[in-house]
Amino acid sequence: MINYFELSLKNLGVSFTSESIDKLKFYIKRVLLFGSRFNLVSKNDLRFDAVLLHALDSVVGFPIIKDNNPHQVLDVGSGAGFPGIILAIFDNSRKYVLLERSNKKVTFLRMMSLELGLDNVKVLERDVADEKDKYEFITIRAFRDIREYASILRLILKNGGLIMAYKGRFDKIKFEISHIESLFSKIEIKESAISDAKERNFLLLYK
């Protein structure tokens, strides 16, 4: 499975070293160790390969980040670190700010940042509605339906900035777009560059 992950990284144009792969393995073992205690992933996903698939799903967003080249990325609702920690492991060229309201998950994220030596990671414990800073690039993977949060996210998005939402089926995205299209200057849907059994699309919201 690790070989498949490395091949996928190459196909995505993501650089990696033996050190970054070792960090990924260490992180996955930590998720498995603390998963139940901190409610990091579902019980069905408390397996190495299952967590690795979450990591792969996280990293497929990297080409979009690379194309836009933001100085800093805000990951809203980071949870166990998907996609924020994973992106930070394989991309040390920019800063990743992980926003999470759960104290348990914040504790885990800060522990991972320290243990992995991720100097490009900053963890904030607060709800997105309480965030005051503005960001040029925002990622969200935790929200099933973006309609409830679109107006809040727009407030913390800089002019000309981009929200990249990890989404599923195309038809469900179209339904969500119909309710939020007036909030953004441009909206795009981009397919995942990695084919998998689970349909993955990216909803791109430009301010």
Curated annotation (Swiss-Prot):
Pfam families: GidB (PF02527)
Signal peptide: none
Protein keywords: Cytoplasm, Methyltransferase, rRNA processing, S-adenosyl-L-methionine, Transferase
Highest taxon of the lineage: Bacteria
InterPro entries named in the record: rRNA_ssu_MeTfrase_G (IPR003682), SAM-dependent_MTases_sf (IPR029063)
EC number: 2.1.1.-
Record bears the keyword rRNA processing: yes
Presence of keyword Transferase: yes
Localization: Cytoplasm
Molecular function terms, GO-annotated: rRNA (guanine-N7-)-methyltransferase activity
GO cellular component, one term: cytosol
Major location category of this protein: cytoplasm
Binding-site positions, S-adenosyl-L-methionine: G77, F82, E100, R101, S102, R141
Cited function: Specifically methylates the N7 position of a guanine in 16S rRNA.
UniProt similarity note: Belongs to the methyltransferase superfamily. RNA methyltransferase RsmG family.
Protein name per Swiss-Prot or TrEMBL: Ribosomal RNA small subunit methyltransferase G
